[in-house]
Structures are given as structure tokens and as C-alpha cells.
Amino acid sequence: MHLPESLHDLADNETVRFLRRPKSISRIFGGVFSLVIFSSLLTDGYQNRTESPQLRCVLNSNHMACSFAVGAGFLSFLSCLVFLAIDAYERRLVGTRFKIAFQLLDFILAVLWAGVWFVAFCFLASQWQHSKSKHFLLGNSSAKAAIALSFFSVPVWILQAYLAFQDLRDEAPVPYKRSLEEGSVVLNTLSPSSTSPSNPPITGPNSLSYTSSALSPYMTTPKAPRLAMMPDS
């Protein structure tokens, strides 16, 4: 099946190729999950009971549970947006140290967010288990959606941590390694040689002997003539 030329151009577009990267896909999923979590609990997470007009959290009437989920979802959503924007300009970064620092920060935050969402899932599921759904007419579906997406956010952030670790490992640990190797090549080229025409060996009775471009450990010195005593005849 032959695709139109416009679709080929769309597939080769830089923006489309950027969005098809595994890291970009994981960030988009993490951001969408976080958006649904905090928006659903922020709108339908606080309801009033049938016998009271006071608003309460649908998760066992625990205000801390709803506040924790809303705050974590909002901060996680902002984190995904910020890192997605930095990824778009990652190729324009020329500083190697800045790239390594950014990838290290990405890895640390991904591990932290994976732990946060695991704790959030356990906490929200425990509060939902102890809550009575008959007390609230609305908000049950929002609570279930927040619990489910909290669970699915854990593998998403683990994937982001793995991808960040891969990028961090691919970077050269010593940025000046290549310059050191080039410097050693230059030094080896400029080292004196015993067969170099610019340093020919010196021959003569009072000359010093050179072996392999290094001075001999023992230097020979001419001995002074000795006076011999002749017997009287």
C-alpha cells in the first residue's frame, strides 16, 4: 500500500520523531495520568453526605488523602511538562556537564516519583477500603480512577528512570578523555629517537654513549697517565 507523499513528510517531521521517542511517550503518559488524578479528585473528590451539607473527602472522609493525591498529581504533571520541554531543546545544549547534570536530575526525580505514586496507591486504596460508598452519592468513580491511575503511574515512572539511566550511562564519564589521548599521541611523536637524523650519535674517544635515547647509567672517563719509577743503573 502506497502512502501519500504528505504522510511520508509527516512521519519524517522532527516534531513527530520527537514525540515517538520512548522517553517522550512515557512523559506524556505520566503527565496525562497525573492530570486525571488531581483534576478528578479536585472536582468530584469532595462531596457532602446525605445527612450533612459539609464537604468531605470521598476517601474515608480523610482530607489528607485527597490533598495528598491532588498535590502529588499537580506537581507530577508540572514535572512532566518541564522535562518534556527540556527534552525538546536537549540537542541545542552544548555543555556536557549540563547534560550530565540534567540526566542525573531526571533519573533521581523519576525514582522519587515512582516511590511517591507507590505510596499514594497504597494510601488511597487503604482509605477507599475503609470508606463507605453509601455515604456519598457522587465521587465514587473519581476515587476509583485516581486509585487505578496511581497504580499505573508507578511503572511509567520506573520506565522513565530506566531511560534516564540509559542516557546517563551512554555519556562519557570523563569529558576530556579524548584530549588526553590526543596529547599522548603528540608527546610520543615529539619524543627523541636514537635513529633520528636531527640527533645523530656522537663518536669519539671522549664522547658519551647513548642507548635508546637514554643516558647510560655508567659514564666512562679517561684515566690520567701514571708516572713509573725507573731503577738506577
From Swiss-Prot:
Residues 204-219 have a biased composition (Polar residues). The chain crosses the membrane at residues 25-45, 66-86, 104-124, 145-165. It comes from the Eukaryota. It is found in: Membrane. It is a multi-pass membrane protein. Its main location: membrane. GO terms for cellular component: membrane. Residues 18-169 form the MARVEL domain. Residues 191-233 are annotated as: Disordered. Keywords: Membrane, Transmembrane, Transmembrane helix. Belongs to the synaptogyrin family. This is Synaptogyrin-4.
